[in-house]
Amino acid sequence: MSTYAYRQAAGIRQALLDRRELALIDVREEADFATAHPLFAVNLPLSKLELEVRRRIPRFTTPLTVYDNGEGLAEIAIERLRSWGYQDVALLAEGLAGWRRSGGELFQDVNSASKAFSELVESVRHTPSLSAQEVQALIDSRQEVVIVDARRFDEYQTMSIPGSISVPGGELALRVESLTPSPQTPVIVNCAGRTRSIIGTQSLINAGVPNPVHALRNGTIGWTLAGQTLAHQQQRQYDPSARASGARAAEVAHFAERAGVAVIDEATLQRWQQQSDRTTFLFDVRSPEEYAAGHYPGSLSAPGGQLVQETDHFASVRGARIVLLDDDGIRAAITGSWLAQMGWETARLSALSTSQLSERGVPAAEVPPGPQAEEISPTQLAQQLEEPGTVVLDFTTSANFVARHIPGAWWLTRSQLRQALEAIPPAQRYVVTCGSSLLARYAVPEVAALTGKPVQLLTGGTLAWIAAGLPLAHGDSGLAVERRDRYRRPYEGTDNSAQAMQAYLEWEYGLVDQLARDGTHGFRVL
């Protein structure tokens, strides 16, 4: 019988204050994680742990503390982590309840540390903002105004402020000069809620942009609650060839230096990467398209705005070292200035030449070896489904499943496998799939153990089924368990209730007080 080490909540909090490396891992599904978690907890659901852990926690000797809320998932996760080579793995004593009983603060939503930091920035710097009504009046006045949307382009396409241009947050300091006709032109920065517009606005102010800059207070949520109309499916983007002036680059570099961002050479980077007792993340903060066209060997794509907004998703080891790179001297500096203020040891790689960006494409995820499995092709499966006795189990995301799936398939997660199988009619054999069948492969022995029936793996996954031109079904009729794999964000999509949007804003406004109660954040706003 396995034995487990335990770490107390008080010890975790002290390690955070001491800036020692640690990863505090919540292995529940994202929707459960979003109900309550410690500030620096990272969500690595047991159901897809294999796909993410090596990217997010690359060093095998990092101290890992795993918890759930009494579901029994943490113990399974520890066994798997040990089997993959992680050497310092422990359970959080009494799990989430133990953290709460010890007096630890609990946060809701996702990316809570980044969002709380953004609210602290506004509180300290008094970041200027305008209400939805004030921005609408500015538009109606026919005065020249530039509205930039700091979210990802796909979010911008879903809904946007009329007349706005997509400029993801990490690109703002580099691109905004090319979008403003004069230094007097007002610039409005928006996101869906509050935090990305706060950081985007303050980034431009910190970069010394001469234009009057304001955040759209409460973003598209505030715009909607004011009864104003959003645009949809817009395509306006910045010119990717646009660059900032030399003066702007110098201003940004100076601010990054003030924040504590070091400038290092390749030799220093290599020395850091060879240290066995420290984690060094190397992130390329340019756009995903630029990264795919050519990037520095070993770097990971992390567009600057997303890295600041979703730091826990990219760098899941608090206390680790973060090195950033770009090819312009601005994006890494402005991104690094925020990470340094968030308490990360941050550096940027000195100017790189095009020849050094020698790797192409997006590297495949590093995952543990998958179990052996009998495979079945899409055409063979289609023939097999013509006769009774075969049930298809789909381990993709619930959103993907609802959008399209193999007719008759059931959706489930590995963390709720036993419960799901009880809800699914028994079969003579099972076929498992997901988008590519990468994740589904790990489920083969688990399904076999619980059912005692033959289990096959769909070669190439549902994508191969689609490529073969085979029929597809849509909708949620095949959900074997509740959709808990993704938290429904009140700031995404166009069908959120006014009550949910207002509650989200009120939660954001309360984050600064939560930070004060928590006391472990280490944030320092310049």
Where are these regions (language model features)?
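Rhodanese-like catalytic fold shared by cysteine-dependent sulfurtransferases
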Residues: 1-23, 27-146, 150-281, 285-391, ...
